[in-house]
Amino acid sequence: VKKIAIACVIAGAVALSGCSSSSDESTRTSTGPAKVAPPAILQAGTLKICAPNDGTPPSVYHDETGALVGSEVDLGKAIAAKLGLKPDFVESAFAAVIPTLQAKQCDVIMAQLYIKPEREKVVDFVPYVYSGTGIAVSKETPANITGMDDSLCGKKVMVAVGTTAESLSQEQSEKCTAAGKPGIDINRNNHADVSLQQVQNGQVDAFLDTAETLGYYATKTGARIQLAGQPFGTIKIGAATLKGNTELHNAIQQALNELETDGTYAKILDQWGQSNLSIQK
């Protein structure tokens, strides 16, 4: 009943144009087409989702087989299923996802898109997860690090050049020295796998990166790491629809609410190591 109700809401809201990648066959089989829709949508029964072809784990990326996978992909499929539609992912470079939406080649963007004021001028957002910075430490020797605080004073950490993690580490190091404590020994490497290996080998005490990236490595790769404290410097990520497309925006919000209520949302985030970035917290 809920699928039919939501499908009625979006009947006039979803655009159908442009080219896209093939959708998940199992989702197509289980959900079927929208029960109520204009002729074009009734024939296709599709929710076109803009996704980046240059994304990163765990949000949206290509696995070793070339398939599009990730937490946002799974959320997109689940939202489409709640709407009674099958998902069809329209891939483009990240920089082109908003123009692709504006050209009506897709209906909604799910592409690690931060909710920022300048973007809210052209799209409407349904927030579904946070992004933030996290601290990875060794499971065996966590070095008494508790988060972005004075427990980092005098510790050797690794960051990537030009990242939020780098600037926040520098700020915390200055706080350490101002308090008469040793500063943070900040080292730089742009390869997360190398940095995490150094954490596990005891060459550095911690590696700072996006919390979602660290959660992915801890959950999906078997890395012997854990996150110290909670993510910080967080910002919301949202599903973006064309400005003023209220029917589709509201339908996606309702679908997400139902995914939160039935536990699907939490299950997806847990599978991808993003439970600590839930919008429900």
Stretch-by-stretch model annotation:
Residues 15-18:
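C-terminal motif of bacterial Sec signal peptides marking the signal peptidase cleavage site
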Residues 20-23:
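Bacterial signal peptide processing site
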Residues 28-112, 262, 271:
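Extracytoplasmic small-molecule ligand-binding "clamshell" domains
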Residues 53, 130-137, 219-257, 274-281:
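Periplasmic-binding protein-like
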Residues 54-56, 68-81, 113, 135-191, ...:
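Bilobed "Venus flytrap"/periplasmic-binding protein-like clamshell domains
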Residues 77, 86-149:
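Acidic, polar ligand-binding/catalytic clefts
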Residues 88-99, 143-144, 183-197, 235:
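Short helix-initiation/N-cap motifs at beta->coil->alpha
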Residues 95-96, 113-120, 170-171, 200-233:
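A ligand-binding cleft/hinge motif common to bilobed small-molecule-binding domains
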